């Protein structure tokens, strides 16, 4: 499976790789506020959706046969109290593969891509109890599943040398297609949980501006479209790196502007929180809250009329688990509600604790946070934290060696 990489895609993918993967942990680590999902292996999980009965669906990859083994698709359904409802490990895929991009269909069937990161992406269908519901939908090896909703799949690929997006139903029937990666004639992503596609990203290949638009149902027509003016002097390229639906029907988005004439390295990235209404009109922006504390945005999350922003310090030790991380809370109307400082103690994770002390002189070991996702649950907000220990030989630019990995869920204090 090959996709033509462009300047726009590189920029927006790099932004997510660097920023979505940092940020945050949570409150006290007593038993009722923390649950360990995996220890030791380099497993990972992503939050996909909440089922109608309050259970949550997680998908990802599980490593088999130690650190040198392959990943296999891993699906976990957790009850509202975070006990396991059911779990599936699919060993039928050849080579390393993962599960991802899931949706609950109108008849209650759960559709999941169980071939992610391979050249044979397959949609499998399950009942709410994890049993097979119907035959698989095998996709073209030249496509990538970008999004899954109850009524369609959004796929991207290269056709005649051009990047394009196609929407299909769960029988494999094409609904419509257009040029561009998710965003028509641009590069971007889709807002999760929208029946009518709302897509956002960048026009990096043309004027470099950030854009968000809503498509009309299953037709390739725009209901509305908003192109953002550059907010800073000397901005070269702008992108909406993430957008989520808010409780008032609008959207909260992370805008990144890259200014290539500032900063020690010749450029500077500036992050801005933007709130759109349901018609795509800008209601407010906020960059000062992050600028004053030398922070970038790591992820945006909407929950019960509030917007939570996972913040990343611009300092070099932003990954270090020993330093507190920050979540800033805003109301949908733009009022800053306060901050939550989060810290997870590596000494309280038994599998990680044994790796904290270096075995050889001249090496250092650092407990680190790799990724955090906020998940809405019946008893509040929880964080799914991926963390571990890295060993470095102490030389400048030396390679780090992975030593331990934990997947933990932790309760988050709200503001």
For every predicted segment, state its role:
Residues 53-54, 107-108, 150-151, 194-197, ...:
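Short coil/turn segments that connect the beta-strands within blades of beta-propeller domains
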Residues 58-62, 112-116, 155-158, 199-204, ...:
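Recurrent small/Gly-Pro-centered beta-turn motifs in extracellular repeat architectures
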Residues 372-415:
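Blade-level signature of beta-propeller repeat domains, shared across WD40, Kelch, NHL, RCC1
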């Amino acid at each position: 499976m090959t996709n033509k990489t462009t300047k726009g895609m590189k920029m927006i993918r790099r932004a997510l790789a660097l920023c979505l993967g940092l940020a945050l942990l949570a409150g006290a680590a007593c038993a009722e506020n923390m649950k360990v999902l995996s220890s030791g292996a380099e497993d990972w999980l992503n939050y996909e959706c909440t089922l109608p009965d309050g259970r949550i669906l997680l998908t990802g990859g599980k490593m088999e046969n130690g650190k040198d083994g392959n990943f296999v698709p891993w699906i976990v359904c957790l009850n509202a109290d975070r006990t396991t409802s059911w779990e599936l490990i699919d060993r039928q895929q050849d080579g390393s593969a993962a599960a991802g991009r899931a949706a609950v269909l109108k008849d209650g069937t759960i559709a999941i891509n169980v071939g992610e990161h391979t050249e044979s992406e397959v949609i499998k269908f399950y009942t709410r109890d994890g049993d097979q519901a119907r035959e698989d939908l095998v996709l073209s090896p030249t496509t990538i599943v970008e999004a899954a909703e109850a009524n369609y799949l959004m796929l991207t690929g290269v056709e005649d040398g051009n990047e394009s997006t196609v929407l299909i139903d769960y029988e494999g029937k094409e609904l419509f297609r257009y040029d561009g990666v998710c965003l028509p004639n641009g590069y971007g992503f889709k807002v999760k949980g929208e029946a009518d596609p709302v897509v956002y990203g960048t026009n990096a290949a043309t004027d470099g501006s950030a854009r968000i638009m809503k498509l009309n149902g299953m037709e390739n027509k725009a209901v509305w479209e908003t192109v953002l003016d550059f907010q800073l002097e000397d901005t070269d390229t702008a992108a909406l790196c993430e957008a989520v639906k808010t409780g008032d029907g609008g959207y909260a988005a992370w805008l990144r502007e890259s200014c290539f004439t500032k900063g020690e390295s010749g450029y500077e990235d500036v992050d801005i929180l933007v709130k759109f209404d349901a018609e795509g009109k800008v209601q407010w922006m906020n960059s000062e809250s992050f600028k004053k504390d030398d922070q970038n945005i790591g992820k945006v999350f909407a929950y019960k009329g509030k917007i939570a922003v996972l913040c990343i310090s611009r300092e070099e030790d932003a990954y270090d688990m020993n330093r507190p991380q920050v979540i800033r809370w805003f109301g949908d109307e733009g009022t800053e509600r306060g901050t939550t400082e989060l810290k997870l103690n590596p000494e309280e994770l038994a599998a990680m604790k044994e790796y904290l002390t270096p075995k050889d002189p001249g090496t250092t070991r650092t407990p680190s946070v790799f990724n955090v996702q906020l998940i809405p649950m019946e008893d509040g907000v929880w964080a799914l934290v991926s963390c571990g220990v890295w060993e470095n030989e102490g030389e400048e630019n030396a390679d780090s060696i992975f030593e331990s990995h934990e997947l933990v869920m932790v309760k988050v204090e709200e503001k």
